[in-house]
């Protein structure tokens, strides 16, 4: 039963329901060999190109980009993609956590985490994690997913927002970022990889609004 198919009573145990959504995420299968290609970063009238490789160890290598800030940005996107494709069992990740139902709204049913991850929250709907609110390295990140890509072997987030904030005060840390991701399979039945990511970031404090596009082309398995 999915979060949207029937009302969920607040306070009930949601471990099995949350596990279904967790296991519905698309991840790379064991034995993933890695891939390489051409990377393009653009912002305004500026475009920078280079080459990249993600190895079987899921470590990213980017070459041919001299601008350190752009190099860091491209590497960061590739790292983020790889880290979210790692396949870890539900027990490996969440064995020390409990999952309790909160209220249900149009975004999904709230999942309140207890145990090791106390303070974290999720929302789930139709076996998709539609909201993530997690404490990571002294900050809080809140992600809302509004559209996904169904691969036939799990879903990938397509359209989503991300906002960082202070865990104590709730003050925002930077502007909200809106993402649109396009994925493609490397070959027939092959692993799905990122083809394009567009990030629009709102202005915050002295930091202006920005729009960055990352494209990954000529993709080939290693």
What are the language-model segments listed below?
Residues 1-44, 66-68, 89-90:
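N-terminal leader/targeting segments and the immediate start of mature chains
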Residues 5-6, 21-23, 106, 113, ...:
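Generic preference for well-ordered secondary structure
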Residues 16-23, 91-95, 139-143, 176:
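Short amphipathic alpha-helical surface micro-motifs
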Residues 18, 22, 33-37, 52-54, ...:
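A structural signal for the main folded, soluble domain(s) of proteins
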Residues 29-31, 44, 103-105, 152-154:
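A generic structural signal for short, solvent-exposed coil/turn residues
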Residues 49-142:
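An acidic-aromatic
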Residues 108-222:
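Gly/Pro-enriched, hydrophobic low-complexity segments
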């Amino acid at each position: 039963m999915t979060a949207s198919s029937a009302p969920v009573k607040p306070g009930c145990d949601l471990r099995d329901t949350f596990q279904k959504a967790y296991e519905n995420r698309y991840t790379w299968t064991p034995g993933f060999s890695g891939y390489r290609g051409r990377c393009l970063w653009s912002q305004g009238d500026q475009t920078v190109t280079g080459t990249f490789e993600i190895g079987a160890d899921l470590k990213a290598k980017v070459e041919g980009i001299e601008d350190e800030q752009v190099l860091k940005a491209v590497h960061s996107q590739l790292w983020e993609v790889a880290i979210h494709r790692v396949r870890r069992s539900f027990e490996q990740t969440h064995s020390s956590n409990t999952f309790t139902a909160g209220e249900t709204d149009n975004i999904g049913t709230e999942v309140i985490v207890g145990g090791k991850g106390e303070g974290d929250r999720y929302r789930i709907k139709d076996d998709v994690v539609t909201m993530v609110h997690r404490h990571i390295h002294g900050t809080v990140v809140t992600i809302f997913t509004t559209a996904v890509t169904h691969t036939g072997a799990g879903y990938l987030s397509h359209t989503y927002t991300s906002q960082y904030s202070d865990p104590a005060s709730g003050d925002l840390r930077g502007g909200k970022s809106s993402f649109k991701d396009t994925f493609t399979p490397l070959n027939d039945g092959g692993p799905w990889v990122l083809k394009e990511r567009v990030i629009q970031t709102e202005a915050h404090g002295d930091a202006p609004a920005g729009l960055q596009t990352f494209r990954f082309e000529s993709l080939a398995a290693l």
